[in-house]
């Protein structure tokens, strides 16, 4: 087993600067080997800041590095699939920011390429690694809340992006729902062992101009087991404070984040059984990335089991149905 996993970071945008680079630069068992971005001065400045020796503007040059074990793909959404495929062709393990591809067929191509290369590809679903989510997961999987009948979730933010790839549907793949809603949908599916959806209804607030991404989306998904998932997201919300919520309703209790609050029926009464403990100083965002990246390093070092992200095929098929429903203004049956 190698003492340290040598990792290259592809893409030097906000998520790399806020999460991947600062976390990996201090992580035991990991070494930042190189950074690649088409903005060479930015890449060089970040390399100097985080003690990275090599910088590149071409992914193929980075992939030729000796003893490169893995890469983090943090490029614009439409580049995820080609960049992941290039890394796998070079026999390098991959952690890719979400979405893994712009559609389900793209994920299937990536899974097939990973199998051919005998390499691992993981998706950066950092929300699954949040401390409060892990606590909720223990209540759900332990059966303490009973059968889940509904999940209500939402994310309201004010993001005044005026230019760039995130505003163009062809490059971003979507707007408010893809960016804010899909992590909530993935979390709902993950907590319910990817229940089978049977119908989708969605309504969106369209962006301005042809080919623009949506500013908001209201989604309802009904599953074969009776579960209903409702999601409301907006990236143009003007209010006193931004809001993020995730609520589970079950036959013997309920739970809500954030912070995590859990109520169970005990002796015929609703009783607060929320886990206690001091809140950490670290934000949920950084804590989740630290846990996710530690897991990635452990998987590459073969200290933790590898699970191919086949569930992302099912996720993106639902996402495709959501957008179809919103575009055609009708319910879609699956």
Give residue spans per PLM region.
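Beta-loop-alpha module in the N-terminal Rossmann-like domain of NAD(P)-dependent dehydrogenases
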Residues: 39, 50-113
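Hydrophobic residues in well-ordered beta-strands that form the structural core
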Residues: 16, 56, 73, 96, ...
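N-terminal Rossmann-like dinucleotide-binding module
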Residues: 1-50
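C-terminal helix-rich "cap/oligomerization" subdomain common to oxidoreductases
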Residues: 1-4, 70-72, 224, 295-334
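Contiguous beta-strand/loop segments that form the cofactor/metal-binding neighborhood of enzyme cores
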Residues: 1, 186-261, 288-305
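Short active-site oxyanion
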Residues: 30-34, 69-71, 174-175
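Active-site loop of classical SDR/Rossmann-like NAD(P)-dependent oxidoreductases
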Residues: 15, 280-294
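Predominantly a Rossmann-like dinucleotide-binding segment in NAD(P)-dependent oxidoreductases
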Residues: 120, 127-210, 329
């Amino acid at each position: 087993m190698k003492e340290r996993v040598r990792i290259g970071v592809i893409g030097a945008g906000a998520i790399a600067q806020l999460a991947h680079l600062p976390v990996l630069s201090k992580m035991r068992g990991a070494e930042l080997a190189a950074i690649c971005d088409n903005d060479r001065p930015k890449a060089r400045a970040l390399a100097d800041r985080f003690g990275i020796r090599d910088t590149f503007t071409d992914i193929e040059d980075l992939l030729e590095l000796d003893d490169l074990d893995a890469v983090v793909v943090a490029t614009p959404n439409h580049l995820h699939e080609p960049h992941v495929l290039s890394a796998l062709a070079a026999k390098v393990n991959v952690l890719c920011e979400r979405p893994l591809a712009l559609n389900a067929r793209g994920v299937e191509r990536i899974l097939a390429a990973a199998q051919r290369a005998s390499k691992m590809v993981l998706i950066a679903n950092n929300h699954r690694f949040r401390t409060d989510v892990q606590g909720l997961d223990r209540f759900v999987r332990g059966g303490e809340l009973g059968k889940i009948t509904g999940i209500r979730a939402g994310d309201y933010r004010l993001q005044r992006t005026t230019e760039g790839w995130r505003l163009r549907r062809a490059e971003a793949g979507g707007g408010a729902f893809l960016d804010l809603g899909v992590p909530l949908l993935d979390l709902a599916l993950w907590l319910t062992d990817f229940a089978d959806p049977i119908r989708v209804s969605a309504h969106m607030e369209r962006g301005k101009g042809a080919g623009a991404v949506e500013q908001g989306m209201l989604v309802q998904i009904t599953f074969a087991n009776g579960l209903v998932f409702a999601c409301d997201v907006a990236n143009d919300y003007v209010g006193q404070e931004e809001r993020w919520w995730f609520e589970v309703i079950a036959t013997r209790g309920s739970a809500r984040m954030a912070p995590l609050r859990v109520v169970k029926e005990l002796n015929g009464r609703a009783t607060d059984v929320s886990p206690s403990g001091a809140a950490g100083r670290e934000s949920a965002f950084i804590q989740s990335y630290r846990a996710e990246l530690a897991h990635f390093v452990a998987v590459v070092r073969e200290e933790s089991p590898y699970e191919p992200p086949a569930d992302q095929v099912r996720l993106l098929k639902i996402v495709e149905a959501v957008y179809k429903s919103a575009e055609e203004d009708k319910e879609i049956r699956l």
